[in-house]
């Protein structure tokens, strides 16, 4: 009787569900300009960078990493000048078509980060939670 072999090839389908994030996204409101860029680093990881400028002065910048480990998808954020530049990891708690929510209930603020893609040429991102 032939023995069954376990496939060593991992599937990253849960991360692939977020492929709509990949690209360059910009927003201008008055004198404020924001840009977020996502690229596919490999099968299990997307990397991102986001910044906001007001009158050409960078007032916010962060590195982002989306990764799938086993069946979980994690969003790790390093917001420069916050949390001593320590990476903070959020776990995906829900995914709908073109929407994802990540949560870390132990973080002071935010506890949730939400991404949506309302149309093919835009994404929306916001944070939620209590200020501890």
Regions found by a protein language model. Give the residues of each.
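Amphipathic alpha-helical hairpins
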Residues: 4, 16-17, 39-41, 132
């Amino acid at each position: 009787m032939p023995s069954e072999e376990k496939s060593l090839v991992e599937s990253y389908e849960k991360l692939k569900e977020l492929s709509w994030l990949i690209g360059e996204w910009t927003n201008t409101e008055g004198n404020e300009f924001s840009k977020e860029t996502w690229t596919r680093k490999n099968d299990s990881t997307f990397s991102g960078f986001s910044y906001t400028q007001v009158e050409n002065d960078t007032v916010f910048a962060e590195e982002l990493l989306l990764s799938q480990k086993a069946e979980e998808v994690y969003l790790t954020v390093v917001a420069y000048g916050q949390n001593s530049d320590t990476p903070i990891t959020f776990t995906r708690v829900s995914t709908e078509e073109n929407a994802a929510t990540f949560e870390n209930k132990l973080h002071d603020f935010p506890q949730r980060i939400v991404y949506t893609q309302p149309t093919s040429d835009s994404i929306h991102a916001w944070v939620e939670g209590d200020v501890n």
